[in-house]
Amino acid sequence: MTDRIGTLVANSGYGVSAEQRNKVLRNTYWLLSLSLVPTVLGAWFGVATGVGQYFSGVMGFVVFLAGAIGFIYAIEKTKNSAAGVPILLGFTFFMGLMLSRLIERTLGFSNGAELIMTAFGGTAGVFLVMSSLATVIKRDLSGMGKWLFVGVIVLLVGSVINLFVGSTAGMMAISMAAIGIFSAYMLYDIKRIIDGGETNYISATLALYLNIINVFQSLLALLGVFGGERD
């Protein structure tokens, strides 16, 4: 969730033609689908090699934060060049690698695979609902941005505190709040594309990807707490 901060880049694309807006939306959905492949590969590699165990605790958080900020900076710098897509896909592999610790822990449950598929299906459902809402809502949602940003800051601070406290209740509260905030961000970001506020499909993909990955990992964490079964 912390890397979401780096994606809030001002973009004055309003007033573009409907044809261009539709093109950006199509390209965004195409690249978003493609980005899931490196994510799965990264998660698989992390679980298969066991490197995911090194991405826990404070040190794991530091590695995650440094890597995410570095990748996001590189993506924003190259989003208008041929290097933008490969760097974005590299970032999604990195995110899959960082997810591998949670995936590995979930697979430790007897119903772990089922929990992962449930989290995936739930995330897909949230995305479909938000995409549908974005197409029917006529009002300008740009005012949501600053409030959602504040929400992300609060989540970040809460996550850092909980790293040291190690509270399960705190983790659950943060996860539930993250699902709500990043679901709203999906609506906000898709609406921006539809309205012409985002004209670069790489930036748009990055924003939506971060929303999706945060909803997924938060939902999976909650499912592990409430639905994890051990033999």
Language model region names:
Residues 1-231:
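A hydrophobic alpha-helical transmembrane-helix feature that marks the membrane cores
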